[in-house]
Amino acid sequence: MSEMASMDPEGIDGVRMTWNVWPRTKVEASKCVIPVAACISPIRYHRDIPSVEYAPLRCRICTAALNPFARVDFLAKIWICPICFQRNHFPPHYHVMSETNVPCELYPQYTTVEYTLPNPSQPTGVGNFDQTGAVSGQPSPSVFVFVLDTCMIEEEFGYAKSALKQAIGLLPENALVGFVSFGTQAHVHELGFSDLTKVYVFRGDKEISKDQVLEQLGLGASGRRNPVGGFPMGRDNSANFGYSGVNRFLLPASDCEFTIDLLLEELQTDQWPVQAGRRQSRCTGVAISVATGLLGACFPGTGARIVALIGGPCSEGPGTIVSKDLSEPLRSHKDLDKDAAPFYKKAEKFYDALANQLVNQGHVLDLFASALDQVGVAEMKAAVERTGGLVVLSESFGHSVFKDSFKRVFEDGEESLGLCFNGTLEICCSKDIKIQGIIGPCASLQKKGPSVADTVIGEGNTTQWKMCGLDKRTCLTVFFDLSSSDQSSAPGGVNNQLYLQFMTSYQNSKGKTLQRVTTVTRQWVDTGLSTEELVQGFDQETAAVVVARLASLKMETEEGFDATRWLDRNLIRLCSKFGDYRKDDPASFTLNPNFSLFPQFTFNLRRSQFVQVFNNSPDETAYNRMLLNRENISNAAVMIQPSLTTYSFNSLPQPALLDVASIGADRILLLDSYISVVVFHGMTIAQWRNLGYQNQPEHQAFAQLLEAPQEDAQMIIRDRFPVPRLVVCDQHGSQARFLLAKLNPSATYNNASEMNAGSDIIFTDDVSLQVFFQHLQKLAVQS
């Protein structure tokens, strides 16, 4: 059982916590240094989760769903809610229940249950489900509006169009498809008008309101209108305006696949003339704004995605990130720090407003940015992250990172991402537990209540969140606070257990409305008497990820925040609190095994791209943070502290220390840092390979040695989204930097004489892990 738990630490519930036993008071919790937080995967697949064809039974006071921790009086047909202790009567259809015949949501092993909710006959607004009516109407189809940048060179444009054709071919037949292209202007293509190509043109140089979008598309309150001058009139044009917007602009994939193929064949790169020394006019903001308005008119409150393929920076209209003058560089982190990025705040404000509109409509923005330059991911971050959108950053639309990732989005079967739509998360918790907020792909619905904390972290001030887009890998970090009242009398005095319930309603890819209910319990402990139970309940991997997410948020939102200093202080406080030592004797310092890996995580976090942002562009930093905030604990931990595997003739593949000492001339190393996978050949291995030894029959063992890391790398790549970049390099080669940058610099130019033969050194002044530990021990034991 323990072996199973270690293989799948999230279990059936998909929940991991920093502390698996909780201190009773706010003061004691603050002494624990690491925040009390839970990382939840709301719709993670697990084969043991039962599915039932009815809606959950809810407590009439706190609205928590019936669960295995409820106390049930089978004779009186009453259940007592474990969260608020309210007595609730079972409805008549539960009256056949007895001690030997209980509904599945009361089985002790089913702490997570998935319910099927009735589909509303028509959308009634964001997150409104008619849970009392019978199932009515067909399941809602998935809706996709593709937004394509035309300001690219022909080769890139060809790759992007080819990917779009493939994606539309992979969509379910009933999925609805719309198409917007943009360059200097934004073009909405009327796919329902098959006689000839018909587009609605929007100026790219000025902001356009939702009402203006609807009016120009003929979807506004005034309804029908004559076409704008210059647009072609078809012979059935008068009848065409009798169609709804859905029939005109959004068609089933099976009906419009041929039309879009023809359209893409004819579509050219942006033909607007560009003067020498000037950037192309690219109106990204207007195009996404128009797509948002179109979906808002046709499908408010129903799951839909805007899939944007962008090949460069916005230089026209709202959302502009750089001027058209090529001599002006794109903003850097230094510019943002000095407030020297003239377009940044205005563009960020524009996308914040767009994020609010998308959240209110229940729609998702997915961003596929492929360019050697920045495209504005940093400014768009709110619109992508708050709607639960996917983001992929690559160098080219022809690169495998984009092509394979884009294909994965639309694939079905085991390899699919399990994309779902229009989700709402609700959290109920025991008295004296307060919710500070969530870091991750969601948006606060501002639903106040007694469980809302005064302090806010991330998306807070609520007990309900909108998740316009979510998938089976989506992970959220929920931060909790304890009420400042003394809990000696309550809740622990009455009940030593605390309860948390996570309820996620969502629309799956087939259009069915489901609700997953997860109820977990943990124990209160009095840490004033002993910290032993607290220590045993510490999850250091989860704690490292939570601290990384919190540090990233603080770097974004707090001016002048020094992440390295904050991480160091927290680590010293944690080691002082939970380490075993004699005061002022560093040699006596030891850490419990439950804490022993945490300093190493912190060391690697300090050196990672999440903290050392000045080596990256603002777009890369925003991309890295969005991935960190949405991935599960195991994947996020690999982003912070990559895994290293060594391959040699003498032994089977085995984990290696993330240290420069692991490099050997006769070894191959495989580094997994999540967004890149590096296969690194030692000097001797590379020489033998270049001489072609692997092609000789007597050297089959060498051929197998070369193949093994490549096969393992492909296994990692197949299981991951976005698809990581594969780097194959040799010792002392130019691309060896991808490995060296992640290794502990135990051997540098300062102590090169101590290194082993065939090993390597790192040219850096960074401290090594060993020196870091020495300083930590010294500071942790100080009086």
From Swiss-Prot:
Gene3D superfamilies hit by this protein: beta-sandwich domain of Sec23/24, Sec23/Sec24 helical domain, Severin, von Willebrand factor, type A domain, Zn-finger domain of Sec23/24
Q: Tell me the residue numbers annotated for binding Zn(2+).
A: 59, 62, 81, 84
A UniProt-annotated Pfam family: Sec23_helical
CDD domains annotated for this entry?
Sec23_C
Q: How does it sit in the membrane?
A: Peripheral membrane protein
Write down any Gene Ontology CC term: extracellular region
Q: Where in the cell is it found?
A: Cytoplasmic vesicle, COPII-coated vesicle membrane; Endoplasmic reticulum membrane; Membrane
One of the GO biological process terms = COPII-coated vesicle budding
Its keywords, alphabetically, are: Cytoplasmic vesicle, Endoplasmic reticulum, ER-Golgi transport, Membrane, Metal-binding, Protein transport, Transport, Zinc
Q: What does this protein do?
A: Component of the coat protein complex II (COPII) which promotes the formation of transport vesicles from the endoplasmic reticulum (ER). The coat has two main functions, the physical deformation of the endoplasmic reticulum membrane into vesicles and the selection of cargo molecules.
- What is the annotated quaternary arrangement, including any partners? Component of the coat protein complex II (COPII), composed of at least five proteins: the Sec23/24 complex, the Sec13/31 complex and Sar1. Interacts with SEC24A.
User: What's the protein name?
Assistant: Protein transport protein SEC23 B
Q: What organism does the UniProt record list as the source? A: Arabidopsis thaliana
Q: What is the lineage of its organism?
A: Eukaryota, Viridiplantae, Streptophyta, Embryophyta, Tracheophyta
